[in-house]
């Protein structure tokens, strides 16, 4: 290991972990060395072994018993597993990037609040729906007050593995909270739809924000376009489906004006096909966060 490289372990060997592995292997700042799972037959562990990583199906206990520990951990297991392991990572001095909805540490959306949370020993990537929609809410709320925001994330059923399905309740709670605390809405709501359509549908998200009746719609639209460009820096397949739509106050919208934004996320196809943009935006955001933290770790060594 050179002084310029930060070592990492991936905890979890499912869809998200395997997609993340391919992104970390391309990183100039992070060296993925370990992948840890609990199923010796998992496809993720097989692929990681084939790519030269050290693997184990004996979980976090095995990793923390090694003579050399990673500088960073990326965990994509489930919320309850990460909650149990997080104090052990902290005790060992290992920085953690949490891709579960456990929310042990502060939630991070790279183009919105990454800089404010760089010193946290454990950062949370919220959810795929959160990464795709919270930046849009933030883009609106930096222009006008947003008393209410609602997001609907629709993802292909085949892209949702057992970990995602086990986390559905946490998904809605964590994403709703992120819409408020990071997106800036006074009240937030999140809905996820697992779409069983064949052939599989690309990830699509709808964002509704209540806005003042006299809001500057041009300024809001410009802010949304700037935020989309920021996201595209690390998720090239993120795009608006059409221009933001503005509606006058109505009974349906609770007497408030609203803006509706429709986006889709096409994945890079690193592990799963491009329709699995819900995985891609999580792993791309986690890689972005990890590289910034790795820069911190490297600077501290000098």
UniProtKB/Swiss-Prot annotation:
It comes from the Bacteria. InterPro entries: Acetaldehyde_dehydrogenase, Acetylaldehyde_DH_C, NAD(P)-bd_dom_sf, Semialdehyde_DH_NAD-bd. The active site is at 128 (acyl-thioester intermediate). It comes from Nocardia farcinica (strain IFM 10152). Gene3D superfamilies: Dihydrodipicolinate Reductase, domain 2 (3.30.360.10), NAD(P)-binding Rossmann-like Domain (3.40.50.720). Pfam families: AcetDehyd-dimer. This is Acetaldehyde dehydrogenase 1. One of its GO terms (molecular function) is acetaldehyde dehydrogenase (acetylating) activity.
């Amino acid at each position: 290991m050179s002084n310029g490289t930060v070592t990492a372990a991936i905890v979890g060997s499912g869809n998200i972990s395997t997609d993340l592995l391919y992104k970390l292997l391309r990183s100039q700042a992070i060296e993925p060395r370990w992948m840890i799972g609990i199923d010796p037959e998992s496809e993720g562990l097989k692929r990681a072994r084939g790519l030269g990583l050290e693997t184990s199906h004996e979980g976090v206990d095995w990793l923390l018993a090694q003579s050399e520990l990673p500088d960073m951990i990326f965990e994509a297991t489930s919320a309850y597993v990460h909650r149990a392991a997080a104090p052990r990572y902290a005790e060992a001095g290992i920085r953690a990037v949490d891709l579960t909805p456990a929310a042990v540490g502060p939630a991070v959306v790279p183009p919105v609040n990454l800089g404010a949370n760089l010193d946290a020993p454990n950062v949370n990537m919220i959810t795929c729906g959160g990464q795709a929609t919270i930046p849009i809410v933030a883009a609106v709320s930096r222009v006008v007050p947003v008393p209410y925001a609602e997001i609907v994330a629709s993802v292909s059923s085949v892209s949702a593995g057992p970990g995602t399905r086990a986390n559905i309740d946490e998904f809605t709670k964590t994403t709703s909270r992120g819409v408020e605390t990071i997106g800036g809405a006074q009240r937030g709501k999140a809905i996820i739809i697992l779409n069983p359509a064949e052939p599989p549908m690309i990830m699509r998200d709808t964002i509704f924000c209540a806005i003042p009746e006299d809001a500057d719609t041009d300024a809001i639209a410009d802010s949304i376009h700037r935020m989309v460009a920021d996201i595209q820096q690390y998720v090239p397949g993120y795009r608006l489906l059409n221009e933001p739509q503005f509606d006058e106050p109505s009974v349906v919208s609770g007497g408030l004006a609203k803006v509706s934004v429709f986006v889709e996320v096409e994945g890079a196809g690193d592990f799963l096909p491009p329709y699995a943009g819900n995985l891609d935006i999580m792993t791309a955001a986690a890689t972005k966060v990890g590289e910034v933290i790795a820069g911190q770790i490297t600077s501290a060594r000098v």
